[in-house]
Amino acid sequence: MRRLIFTFCLLLWAPSIPLSAQNTLSSIRQRYAEQQEAIRHMEAGSMPREYYHVHGAVNLPATGQHDEDIYLYYEEVEERADENAIYLPHRLTFVTTAYNYSFRRFYEEFLYDADGRVAFIYARNPDIVFGLDYDFRFYFSRGKLLHAIVKRGINKDADAARLIANGTWNASLPTDSEGHQQVCAGDKLPKEFHSVLADCLKSAKRYHKLFQDTDRALYGALF
């Protein structure tokens, strides 16, 4: 009975996400779902394709062939258009990028708000611990980190038995439907992942500039 009362008290005092933050998270997730739905329609041919596809192939010293596929999705912005404009200006909404360094494969997504600030980042990073893939989800409000979720799972090409035997992977911990274990979740990001967040934010700015330059070169010529 004492244990039940103690557990109940812990639940009452456990930190919760403020209502305003919950609303922001819900809004970001809704916009993300809408973007995914739009991409599915584009791929099916049921709506016009509105993106730039950039592919880079570079032979890097020591690591060899490096390939990167970047998709820059955009939308038309009526409220910023001149009243006599035939072509409406574009605004970046979403970016996906898949790339490799040697045999390690990375994947990232960036969702932007109407002001061009990143609102959500998803990053799959195989570089934190050898043999494991780390999944990072960063949510932002007005450019500041609002919520972070970090999970990890065994890389599909890794020797799972060896990772368990050497203590890299604790098989006794619970996993989700994808076989991932949650490392942390909340508005405070552990210091060991600060560099990952910093790199992701730099990438968000770099891809936004890439969109602006590409849009100006390919679409701006029509004005």
Segments predicted by a language model, with ranges:
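Short N-terminal edge-element motif at the start of the domain
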Residues: 54-118
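Short loop/beta submotifs within extracellular cysteine-rich repeat domains
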Residues: 117-120, 145-146
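Bacterial N-terminal signal peptides
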Residues: 7-16
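Long terminal segments
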Residues: 22-80, 130-223
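Short beta-strand-initiation
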Residues: 7-8, 105, 133
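Beta-turn initiation residues at beta-strand->coil junctions
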Residues: 96-100, 122-126, 150-152
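Sec/Tat signal peptide C-region and signal peptidase I cleavage site
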Residues: 17-21
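Positively charged n-region of N-terminal signal peptides that target proteins for export
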Residues: 1-4
